Amino acid sequence: MAVEIDDHQDIFAAASVAQIHEALGQLHEQEASVTQRLNALIASQKDLSRELGRLDLLRAHLGTQAVNTRAISSGMLSDAASTANRISSAVKRLDQEQSNVKATLEVVEQVAELKACVLGVHGSMGAPQDWETAAGYLSRAAKIPDDVVNGSFAEEIVPTAEVPDPPRVTLDAAAESLCGLFLREFEKAAQEGDGSKVTRFFKLFPLIGRTNVGLDAYGRYVCQGVASRARTNFNSAAPAQRNEGFFYGNTITKLFEHIAQIVDGHEPLVERHYGPGMMQKVIERLQIEADVQGGIVLDTWHEERHIDRKLTDIKSYAFSFLVQSFLPSQKPAAGTPRSSSPANGAGRASEDEGVDMKEIDGLLGEGALILGRYALYARFLSDKCAPSEPEDRIDYGLVMPNFLATSNLHKKVNSHLIEPVNAMTTFFFRRSVEKAFQLDEPPADLTLNPTKPLGSNPPFITSAVDDVMYIVNQVIQRTLATSQRSVVSSVVPAVSHILGAEFIGMIQRKMRDESYPKPVIQGGLPPEDKVIAFLVLINNLDIANDYVKRIVQQQLGRQSQGGEDDVKSPLHDLFPFGHDAVFVENTLKAMEKAFASKSGDLLNDGITVLFSNVLKPRIRPILAEAFRDVKYDPEDGENEDKEEEDVDVVKSRFDRGWGVVIRPIKRILTSANFDRLLALGLNSLASSLEKRIKSYYGRVNELGAVRLERDISGIITAATSGGAYSLRDVFQKSTQMTLILNMEDDEFAEVAEDTSGDSGIPWVLDVEERKRVRAIVKG
């Protein structure tokens, strides 16, 4: 329709006869097409009607077949289904009857077994008094289900004229009677010390279902042995023995060893007769006795050693020497009196008498011994009580059982040992640092005169460094030997703080107030004694840093040469619980890092002061003397003989002057410190050489450039003699400057604009600098 409308519109819109004919032609074509399609549809209608008729016939035929099929199903298959249903029901009834028969037979057999056990128990407990057999019958009866034992059938069948009571009553009465009998016999054997009888009756308790009674009796038995031996060890000692340094440590060690021997020796027996994991109940009972006996030892140690009084004395100690040393008004003379001098002895006598360091050291040794033994004991019990298979695969380390973590002994270890040991160790170390500086002595007979021998052996440090680092090593070793994380977490940070604040602080104060190398007169050099003292203090820092690093690495116990990151640290043996070993390792590394940082900062400052006040003022005069009366613009043939004689005059002058300054310092400084100082000195020397070369602008000809290059090279060789070849790197600018001075014009033209290194020379001079250097040579 839309086409017709459009066509009519075209016709109506026609403006000429030709357009009308064209529109009519299109309409005729459309008419022919529509007529053809209609004829095709009319022709296909007959075939469609015929196919629909065939479908109606097929539908009627299928309806007939469906009726026949339903008739066959209801007539034939229903009989088969009914038969199958009857057979299935019969099979099910047969299976049920069979299972009932089996259940009945099983009950009959169990009742027969029950009757045999009841009669066996009654017979064995009679005249024969065969307790093992009676217990065996009770054990067999315990395997019979309770519903059978308590059932009416058993109550009807089992009783006899000799045993008229129901089986449950008979069994319970027999078990109770045997339990009382076994308990009496067990305790009697324990009192008599008859080990075989103790074992005999101990094995019978689980057979009669009295496991807890047996374990409790056994626990009391072994605890009596523990208590008896502990009292003997403690009370048999004479008063003089109790005053010995490690009496209490040895006593509690014997207690722990005895308990460990009992657990190790008796565990197989308990596990075999009572089942896996049952030894833990005996261990818990032993721990109660350990709380008592160990508590007595710790209480007596705390009282006899006057721990509370010692802690009071420690808290009241003023550390007068350290405090006064850091006061701003403190201006000690260069020769500080020794502590043994009459000038200082009177002021400290009362303090030294108030706290006996030897006694504190002894208490710390004994305390560390007890803590270490307790750690081994705790680890042993934790291993014994640990589950055979962890709940998950994540390794949380060893876990302390709850009965031990909440025990009175554990609480007393914390209050009577760990807290006092932490306080006394911190005091002991700080007082040792104070004492070391009170007794500090510099190395004897040091001199800057290279012709005189040194009166000491290197490294040249004061006595305080060796003294303090010896105490650091001792304190760290003793702290780790306790195997207590709480001791490490308190002591190691305290040691780190004292080292950083007071050990380094004392050296810093001496460097600033007593030994600062300041010239006496303007433009002069510092006094020799000040320079020597300053050098020694710088050595103190370097050697102390090396000591601390070695102490920590020794405790970590790892070999850095193997390159294996998964090497297990020995700290895992000392600290097996949780992640304590990782915590301890990180704490030690933090101490090492903190000390290295503080000592390194002060060391670098000291090297800078030494360079600025001692070495730097000498560099310019040394160079001036080396280049004195040397000309680099000689005429051809002028003074050739003289120049050949003085070919190395600059190098020899410099070597002489440089050696006068450097060699005395090198004799005293450690090699690491000397390398640090030399690096600063060479940087300054390189800068001075660059300025010296530039100062010859317009005063260097081609012959002079050759000699200047030789002289600069000679100075570099003399300055870096005996050091690493890499020290020459700071002179790259000077070397390249002399290289440019001696280039031919065409050679220089090739490298003048080189910025990419195509010339084969890694230039440190930029393009403009190269041009300015080239201009130094007279054209």
Question: PLM features: what roles do these ranges have?
Answer:
Residues 133-136, 154, 387-389, 393, ...:
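Extended intrinsically disordered, low-complexity coil regions enriched in Ser, Thr, Gly, Ala
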Residues 1-50, 57, 87-89, 100-101, ...:
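N-terminal alpha-helical scaffolding segments that mark the starts
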Residues 372, 408-710:
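Extended alpha-helical rod/solenoid/coiled-coil scaffold segments used as assembly/tethering elements
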Residues 81, 85-88, 92-412, 416-417, ...:
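Extended, noncatalytic alpha-helical scaffold/tether regions
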Residues 399-424, 428, 432, 570, ...:
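Eukaryote-biased recognition of C-terminal alpha-helical segments
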Residues 22, 29, 33-36, 61, ...:
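Extended alpha-helical scaffolds
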Residues 657-660, 664, 712, 716, ...:
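Terminal end segments
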Residues 54, 58-88:
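Acidic, polar low-complexity intrinsically disordered regions
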